[in-house]
Design a protein with these regions (language model features):
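Domain-level signature for soluble enzymes in the chorismate/prephenate branch of the shikimate pathway
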Residues: 1-87
């Protein structure tokens, strides 16, 4: 495989992963919206500092080569969006 074909192949793989990531984020947001409805029904605060800390700690445990602080920033944005959509 020449370099141009290799480049195209790798980019197609990245495009496929990007599509999967978007689908997973959509699924995550849907679940988050369900949680928001339940919390409102139970008269609980939508923001849960403990849960946020758990998620960020999990990043420390799971991230191998992706910079942990960058992943944490991404997840902070994901959680912020989830919270905004719950309101």
């Amino acid at each position: 495989m020449d370099d141009e074909k290799a480049l195209l192949f790798i980019r197609e793989e990245i495009d496929s992963i990007d599509s999967e990531l978007i689908s997973l984020l959509e699924s995550r947001l849907n679940l988050s919206l369900q949680i928001g409805k339940l919390k409102k029904k139970m008269d609980k605060d939508l923001y849960d500092e403990e849960r946020e800390a758990e998620i960020l700690k999990k990043i420390d445990e799971l991230a191998l080569i992706y910079p942990k602080e960058d992943l944490k920033s991404i997840f902070m944005e994901i959680m912020k969006t989830s919270l905004n959509q719950q309101q």
